Curated annotation (Swiss-Prot):
Gene that this polypeptide is encoded by: Acap2
Regulation: GAP activity stimulated by phosphatidylinositol 4,5-bisphosphate (PIP2) and phosphatidic acid.
Coarse class of the protein's main subcellular location: membrane
The name this protein goes by in its record: Arf-GAP with coiled-coil, ANK repeat and PH domain-containing protein 2
Recorded GO CC terms: endosome membrane; plasma membrane; ruffle
C-alpha cells in the first residue's frame, strides 16, 4: 500500500505533516465533489433512458397496432410483428443495461461517498479536536509558574495525556487517509469496469438478435421487388374483371338458385330469407341465411356473429307451408323448435328446400362430425359469413391438440368406457375422455383429475408434450392391472351410474392397481438397484426399447415415433458434475415392483425421465413431495431438474409437486434449474409461483446465481418476474394479473423451450467460446 502521509512525520507533528494533511484534505474534498457530480449525472442518464424506453414501448405498440390492422396481409403482418418483437427485445436489453448502470455506478459510488468519506470526515473532526486540546495543554504548561509545584505537575500530566491521545488519534487519522487514498482507486475502477461489462453484454445481445434477423431482412427486400410486380399484375386483372362484370346480364336470378354440397368453403347455399320471430308479435325480419357444415345459420350484419338456427341438420325436417297468408314460405322443424322462413320466389323456395334435404342426406353419409370443426362459426368466403381471426386461431389450436393427442396408442377411444373420438382429457393423468366421463372426472376434484377440452381450450406446449408421453394404454396398464383377475368389466357408453362407480373405484380407491408388498427401506433398495443394474446391463437397452418410452429432454418435439408417441432427443447434460452423491445410471433400472418403495421409484424415474414409471409410482401411493434422506433431502421435482426434462417437471407440478420445497442446502427446484442453466425449467417454475427471493445456505438467491453465471436469458426472466411481482403488489388486490410484456416474453420463452430449445443454448455456447 502506498502511503500518502508518513507515520514518522505524524508522530513529530511537523509542519511537513500539517502541509501533507492540508493537501490530502483538499484532495478528498475535490474528490467528493467529482463523485457527487458523477452520481447526479448517472441518475439523470438513467431517468432519461427510462423515459426513452417508455416512449419506445409506445412506439412498439403503435407498430403492433399497425400489424393487427394488416392482419389480412401476411407479409406486412409478419414483418411488422417480427420487427416489433425484435425491437421490444432491444428495449428489454436497454432496461437491463440501465439497471446494471444504476448498480455499478450510482449504488457503488454513493456507498463509497456515504461510508468511506464519512469515516474520513469523522476522523478529521476527532483529529482537529485533539489538536486543539494539545495546543491548549502546551500553552497552559508554558504559562505555569515554577514556584507553583502543584500546578506544574498537573500541567505536565495533562500535557502528557494529551500528547498520548493526540498521537493515537493522529495515527488513526493517517491510517484512514492512506486506506481511503488506496481504496478510491479500486472502487472507481471497479464500478467503471462493471459499467463497461454491462455495455459489452448489451451490444453482444443486440448483435446476436440482429444476426438472426439479418437473413429475414434480406428476404424481405427481395419480396418487396416482387410485390411491386404483383401489384401491377393484380391491377390489370381487376380492370379486366370489372369490364367482364359490366357486360354481364343481371336480368335473371338463376344464380341465386345454385347450391353445392361439395363447396370448398363448406357453404352449401346462402342468400336472404325472411324469418318469422318467435315473439308475441310474430314479426318478419330479413336476414342472411346459409347452410354450412351441417348447420343452418343466419346473421343481420357482416360483423355480427352468426346465430345457429339448427345445430345438426340430421335431426330436423323441412316442409312447405301453405296454411299461412304469406307466399313462398317453408318451415324447418327440429326436435326442440321450428323456424318459419320465406323466400323471394317459388324457385328460391324450392331451391332452399332441396338444399336442406340434400344437406341432411349428405350429413348422414359422412362419418365425421363436421359441426364441431367450425365451433358454430363459418369459413371466410366472398359474400359469406365471417368467422373472425380469433375463431380461426382457436380452431387451429384445437385441431392440432386433438390430432396430436389422438395419435398416441389407445387415445382414439375413451380411457374409461371405450367411446370413440374422445374430445376431453385429464392432464394430470395423461388420458383422453368422452364428454360424459370427463364430467365424472371433474366431480372427483382437481386433486384426482384435472379436466381440459382438446378442442376448446388453449394448450401450452409443455402440457401437450406431457399428453404425448403417456396415453390411455400406458395408464390403463397401471390402473387396470387387476381388472381381468378380479372379473370386473368396463362400463359401456351411456351407463352413467356404472361409469361413475367404476371411475371412482379406478382412480380414487385404486382397486384395480396391483399393490406392492414387502417394501424395502430406501438404502436397501439403492443397493439392490446398483447390483441389479450390473446384472441387467446387457439387456437394459432391449428392455428400454420395449417398455420405456423415449426419454424427454428440455427440448422440443421432433417427430412422431411408430406408436404415435412424440419422440424427443436424449442428450447428456453439460452439467453432469452437478449431481447428487452416487453415480447415476444411464438407463432406468428398477427392482421388482413388489419390493419397491413408491417414493423412491418416483424419485428415480423423475431423474430418468420415465413418465410411465412415475405414473405407476403415483398410482401406488407415492408422495409427490417425497424427500430422499440419503441424498440431501432432494425431491422428485429436483431430480427432474437434474435430469434436464421440462415434461417431467410439468407432470410433477400437475400432480401437486411443491415448487418451493428445498433440500438440505436450502436450494429449491428454481435454484437448481438456475445453476444448471435450464432456461425452460426456470420459466416453468416462475409461471407456477416459485419463490425467487429464497436464499440457500450460502445466502444466494436464483438471481444472484444467474448474474454470477452471466446467463442473460435466466437473468431476464428472473428480473421480469420480480418487476411484475412488484407491479402487482403496488396495484393492490384489484390489479391486473400481469404486465402484457411480461406475459408475452414468458409465453415466447415457453414456446422456445418446448419447440426450439437450441435457441436457449446461447449461454452454454458463449461459455464454450471463452
Amino acid at each position: 500500500m502506498k502511503m500518502t502521509v508518513d507515520f514518522e512525520e505524524c508522530l513529530k507533528d511537523s509542519p511537513r505533516f500539517r502541509a501533507a494533511l492540508e493537501e490530502v484534505e483538499g484532495d478528498v474534498a475535490e474528490l467528493e465533489l467529482k463523485l457527487d457530480k458523477l452520481v447526479k449525472l448517472c441518475i439523470a442518464m438513467i431517468d432519461t433512458g427510462k423515459a426513452f424506453c417508455v416512449a419506445n414501448k409506445q412506439f412498439m405498440n403503435g407498430i403492433r397496432d399497425l400489424a393487427q390492422y394488416s392482419s389480412n396481409d401476411a407479409v406486412v403482418e409478419t414483418s411488422l410483428t417480427k420487427f416489433s418483437d425484435s425491437l421490444q427485445e432491444m428495449i428489454n436489453f436497454h432496461t437491463i443495461l440501465f439497471d446494471q448502470t444504476q448498480r455499478s455506478i450510482k449504488a457503488q459510488l454513493q456507498n463509497f461517498v456515504k461510508e468511506d468519506l464519512r469515516k474520513f470526515k469523522d476522523a478529521k473532526k476527532q483529529f482537529e479536536k485533539v489538536s486543539e486540546e494539545k495546543e491548549n495543554a502546551l500553552v497552559k504548561n508554558a504559562q505555569v509558574q515554577r514556584n507553583k509545584q502543584h500546578e506544574v505537575e498537573e500541567a505536565a500530566n495533562i500535557l502528557t495525556a494529551t500528547r498520548k491521545c493526540f498521537r493515537h488519534i493522529a495515527l488513526d487519522y493517517v491510517l484512514q487517509i492512506n486506506v481511503l487514498q488506496s481504496k478510491r482507486r479500486s472502487e472507481i475502477l471497479k464500478s467503471m469496469l462493471s459499467f463497461m461489462y454491462a455495455h459489452l453484454a448489451f451490444f453482444h445481445q443486440g448483435y446476436d438478435l440482429f444476426s438472426e434477423l439479418g437473413p429475414y431482412m434480406k428476404d424481405l427486400g427481395a419480396q418487396l421487388d416482387r410485390l411491386v410486380v404483383d401489384a401491377a399484375k393484380e391491377k390489370r386483372e381487376m380492370e379486366q374483371k370489372h369490364s367482364t362484370i359490366q357486360q354481364k346480364d343481371f336480368s335473371s336470378d338463376d344464380s341465386k338458385l345454385e347450391y353445392n354440397v361439395d363447396a370448398a368453403n363448406g357453404i352449401v347455399m346462402e342468400g336472404y330469407l325472411f324469418k318469422r320471430a318467435s315473439n308475441a308479435f310474430k314479426t318478419w325480419n330479413r336476414r342472411w341465411f346459409s347452410i354450412q357444415n351441417n348447420q343452418l345459420v343466419y346473421q343481420k350484419k357482416f360483423k355480427d356473429s352468426p346465430t345457429v338456427v339448427v345445430e345438426d341438420l340430421r335431426l330436423c325436417t323441412v316442409k312447405h307451408c301453405e296454411d299461412i297468408e304469406r307466399r313462398f314460405c317453408f318451415e324447418v322443424v327440429s326436435p326442440t323448435k321450428s323456424c318459419m322462413l320465406q323466400a323471394d320466389s317459388e324457385k328460391l323456395r324450392q331451391a332452399w328446400i332441396k338444399a336442406v334435404q340434400t344437406s341432411i342426406a349428405t350429413a348422414y353419409r359422412e362419418k365425421g362430425d363436421e359441426s364441431e370443426k367450425l365451433d358454430k362459426k363459418s369459413s371466410p368466403s366472398t359474400g359469406s359469413l365471417d368467422s373472425g381471426n380469433e375463431s380461426k386461431e382457436k380452431l387451429l389450436k384445437g385441431e392440432s391438440a386433438l390430432q396430436r393427442v389422438q395419435c398416441i396408442p389407445g387415445n382414439t377411444s375413451c380411457c374409461d368406457c371405450g367411446l370413440a373420438d374422445p374430445r376431453w382429457a385429464s392432464i394430470n393423468l395423461g388420458i383422453t375422455l368422452c364428454i360424459e366421463c370427463s364430467g365424472i372426472h371433474r366431480s372427483l376434484g382437481v386433486h384426482f383429475s384435472k379436466v381440459r377440452s382438446l378442442t376448446l381450450d388453449t394448450w401450452e406446449p409443455e402440457l401437450l408434450k406431457l399428453m404425448c408421453e403417456l396415453g390411455n394404454d400406458v395408464i390403463n396398464r397401471v390402473y387396470e392391472a387387476k381388472l381381468e383377475k378380479m372379473g370386473v368389466k368396463k362400463p359401456q357408453p351411456g351407463q352413467r351410474q356404472e361409469k361413475e362407480a367404476y371411475i371412482r373405484a379406478k382412480y380414487v380407491e385404486r382397486k384395480f392397481v396391483d399393490k406392492y408388498s414387502a417394501l424395502l427401506s430406501p438404502s436397501e433398495q439403492e443397493k439392490r438397484i446398483i447390483s441389479k443394474s450390473c446384472e441387467d446391463q446387457r439387456l437394459s437397452h432391449a428392455r428400454a426399447s420395449v417398455h420405456t418410452p423415449v426419454k424427454s429432454n428440455d427440448s422440443g418435439i421432433q417427430q412422431c415415433s411408430e406408436d404415435g408417441r412424440e419422440s424427443l432427443p436424449s442428450t447428456v447434460s453439460a452439467n453432469s458434475l452437478y449431481e447428487p452423491e452416487g453415480e447415476r445410471q444411464e438407463s432406468s433400472v428398477f427392482l421388482d415392483s413388489k419390493h419397491l418403495n413408491p417414493g423412491l421409484q418416483l424419485y428415480r424415474a423423475s431423474y430418468e425421465k420415465n413418465l410411465p414409471k412415475m405414473a405407476e409410482a403415483l398410482a401406488h401411493g407415492a408422495d409427490v413431495n417425497w424427500a430422499n434422506s440419503d441424498e440431501n433431502q432432494a425431491t422428485p421435482l429436483i431430480q427432474a431438474v437434474l435430469g434436464g426434462s421440462l415434461v417431467t417437471c410439468e407432470f410433477l407440478l400437475q400432480n401437486g409437486a411443491n415448487v418451493n420445497q428445498r433440500d438440505v442446502q436450502g436450494r429449491g427446484p428454481l435454484h437448481h434449474a438456475t445453476v444448471l442453466g435450464h432456461t425452460g425449467q426456470v420459466c416453468l417454475f416462475l409461471k407456477r409461483g416459485a419463490n425467487q427471493h429464497a436464499t440457500d445456505e450460502e445466502g444466494k438467491d436464483p438471481l444472484s446465481i444467474a448474474v454470477e453465471a452471466a446467463n442473460a436469458d435466466i437473468v431476464t426472466l428472473l428480473r421480469l418476474a420480480r418487476m411484475n411481482e412488484e407491479m402487482r403488489e403496488s396495484e393492490g388486490l384489484y390489479g391486473q394479473p400481469g404486465d402484457e410484456t411480461y406475459q408475452d416474453i414468458f409465453r415466447d420463452f415457453s414456446q422456445m423451450a418446448s419447440n426450439n430449445p437450441e435457441k436457449l443454448n446461447r449461454f452454454q455456447q458463449d461459455s464454450q467460446k471463452f
